Amino acid sequence: VEHGVTRRKAEPVTDGRRARGARRRAEIIEATLRVVQRDGAGGVTHRTVAREADVTTSLTAYYFATLDDLLVAALSTVADEYTRRLHEIIESDTDDLEGLAALVASAGGEGRRRALAERELSTMAARRPALRPVARRWREVVAQIGERHSTDPRAVDALVAATDGLCADILLTDARPDVRRIRAVLAHSLRTGED
């Protein structure tokens, strides 16, 4: 009580505006990924994303001032999912190459649409430098798996390249991926063939 007025301890303002903003931002990112999955990365504009998210174009521009901001956010969402799953593989007590092979194989199953969006956005990074750091993120974690098996940087590079190539191959075919075959290719990539 101060000057006859009872004061309550100040509570942080949690009127939901921040939570609504974060939710709206996430909805716009998910809409961007749906546009990429359906129309390709070239189909992403503030207008197409706004239509997909059922919001105004000005709202997408409010959260993402430039198209690069929108594309980086979309690619970051996919890259975060992949790196989280890769870290789970690294931290588990199971065969990490088997886990990596299963993750690669998922591009031919339930993860196909997401993998296709990631591939398209990563390829776009060749022309849009703002996307490059995010596009490299999953490769760095795959390299960590390689470093658990080999101290030879060529072998680690080969594992990263094999993983990337296998993902592309799966997306280009309708064949059901064989996890054992993928694991064998990944293991083979870690052998340099030189003494």
What are these language model-derived features?
Residues 27, 31-69, 73:
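Helix-turn-helix
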Residues 83, 109-119, 124-158, 184:
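Amphipathic alpha-helical packing segments from all-alpha helical-bundle domains
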Residues 76-81:
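Short, basic, alpha-helical segments at the C-terminal edge of helix-turn-helix-like DNA-binding modules
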